[in-house]
């Protein structure tokens, strides 16, 4: 059958060795729009290698490269065009350094049956080459039209309540060239740069990478709630609810709930939700 959870989960995976330096981090940050306040020391720390802080979402770059081969591994027989990135979850074990040599272990964690779609959960465990754990990234990927194979439907979603006045509401503009810059960090999907490809996919023009939106919103939360301290992020998860066109403005809202913040990001120009069911977990 196209999706076989037992085969997929049992299939051996290969660790990926990777490394980064300050230049790679700087490019990622600029791809998220960092540097817009050129006289603010807290903002400059994202774009000046002399005192560089690293957003934890940078870890999706090596994490994605590690899990990419597992997307079409044994037990996962489908057309890649059916794949839709549904959710992203990050757990930070230690702050990311500006330079590092790392190893990421990919894992097929689960394959759930969602009726009309399959849900593939891939996990990337990233550690330094001396064994220090840095982060865990989970990629939840919907495979459209590949459900109904009789598997486990997975855990129920957690309760979600964003009533009341938010602790933070901030507007985050995206640049018309945002996707063109972000793709330089490695995601060269033509959906984000080729107008013809985007039109065939049903969009008016190329859309922004979901993981770019994910990183931009995380930065807004770090700046607005954590005093710009990237090391204060313990976890960050979000559901990709809608697309963003480069040049649009995100309105990010966060509600304090016990030890975490519930977060939502909307597109101001179209009144649609881009990120939902998002949770920031400070250390």
Task: Please give the residue ranges for each predicted region.
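Hydrophobic, proline/glycine-rich low-complexity stretches
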Residues: 1-101
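A contiguous, surface-exposed recognition patch within enzymatic or periplasmic domains that forms
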Residues: 2-47, 158-213, 220-223
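Residue-level preference for alpha-helix termini and adjacent loops
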Residues: 19, 43-46, 54-63, 82-83, ...
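HotDog/MaoC-like acyl-thioester-processing domains
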Residues: 1-14, 83-170, 244-247, 251-283
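Catalytic-pocket segment enriched in acidic/His residues
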Residues: 191-192, 196-277
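Phosphate-binding glycine-rich loops and adjacent basic patches that engage nucleotide phosphates
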Residues: 21, 63-70, 140-145, 174-185
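N-proximal short alpha-helices
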Residues: 1, 63, 69, 75, ...
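A broadly conserved detector of short glycine/acidic/proline-rich loop/turn motifs that flank catalytic sites
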Residues: 24, 31-32, 174-176, 185, ...
């Amino acid at each position: 059958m196209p999706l076989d959870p037992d085969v997929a989960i049992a299939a051996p995976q290969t660790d990926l060795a990777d490394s980064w330096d300050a230049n790679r981090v700087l490019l990622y940050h600029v791809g998220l729009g960092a540097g817009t306040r050129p006289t603010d020391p807290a903002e400059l720390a994202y774009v000046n290698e002399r005192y560089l802080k690293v957003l934890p979402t940078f870890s999706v770059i090596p994490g994605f490269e590690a899990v990419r081969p597992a997307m079409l591994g044994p037990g996962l027989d489908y057309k890649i065009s059916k794949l839709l990135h549904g959710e992203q979850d990050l757990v930070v074990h230690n702050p990311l350094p500006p330079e590092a040599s790392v190893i990421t272990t990919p894992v097929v964690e689960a394959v759930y049956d969602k009726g009309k779609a399959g849900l593939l959960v891939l996990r990337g465990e990233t550690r330094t080459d001396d064994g220090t754990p840095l982060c865990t990234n989970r990629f939840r990927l919907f495979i459209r039209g590949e459900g109904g194979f009789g598997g486990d439907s997975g855990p129920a979603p957690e309760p979600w309540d964003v009533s009341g006045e938010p602790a933070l509401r901030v507007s985050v503009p995206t640049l018309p060239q945002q996707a063109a810059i972000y793709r330089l960090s490695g995601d060269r999907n033509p959906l984000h740069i080729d107008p013809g490809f985007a039109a065939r996919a049903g969009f008016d023009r190329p859309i922004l990478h979901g993981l770019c939106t994910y990183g931009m919103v995380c930065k807004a939360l770090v700046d607005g709630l954590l005093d710009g301290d990237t090391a204060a992020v313990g976890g960050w998860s979000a559901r990709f609810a809608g697309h963003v066109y480069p040049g649009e403005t995100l309105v990010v809202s966060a509600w304090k709930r016990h030890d975490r913040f519930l977060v939502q990001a909307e597109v101001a120009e179209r009144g649609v939700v881009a990120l939902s069911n998002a949770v920031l977990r400070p250390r």
